[in-house]
Amino acid sequence: MATLTIDEIVEAIKNMSVLEVAELVKRLEEEFGVSAAAMVAAAPAAGAAAGAPAQAEEKTEFDVILKSPGKNKIQVIKVVREITGLGLKEAKELVDNAPKPIKEGVPKEEAEQIKKKLEEAGAEVELK
């Protein structure tokens, strides 16, 4: 088996489409039994411990987390597609693998609108 350098791997990833990168992330998660979403969510929590009072007052960006699609999964998939611009297959995988982040680092107003749309479709949503 040929050994690739990190630079070669980065170049290969730079030439991939967004959908191919999403599939790569999914395969890496399955192969190594990890979740990229958990790492992203855990990073702010570690920083928040150091300056918790200031962080709570200044929080302007939120992550919209789909906790559960509820009973009306098809409607939730449609809303996820509308919000993220994902294709049907990718949106279905995201909904099927809940809890997953739908959007990250969005302003409070936008996060609340997304949460409202998803909850109207029957999903259980959390803002972090």
From Swiss-Prot:
GO terms for cellular component: cytosolic large ribosomal subunit. The keyword Ribosomal protein applies. Coiled coil: none annotated. GO terms for molecular function: mRNA binding; structural constituent of ribosome. Keywords: Ribonucleoprotein, Ribosomal protein. The keyword Nucleus does not apply. GO terms for biological process: translation. Forms part of the ribosomal stalk which helps the ribosome interact with GTP-bound translation factors. Is thus essential for accurate translation. NCBIfam families: L12. Belongs to the bacterial ribosomal protein bL12 family. HAMAP family: Ribosomal_bL12. Homodimer. Part of the ribosomal stalk of the 50S ribosomal subunit. Forms a multimeric L10(L12)X complex, where L10 forms an elongated spine to which 2 to 4 L12 dimers bind in a sequential fashion. Binds GTP-bound translation factors. This is Large ribosomal subunit protein bL12. It comes from Aquifex aeolicus (strain VF5).
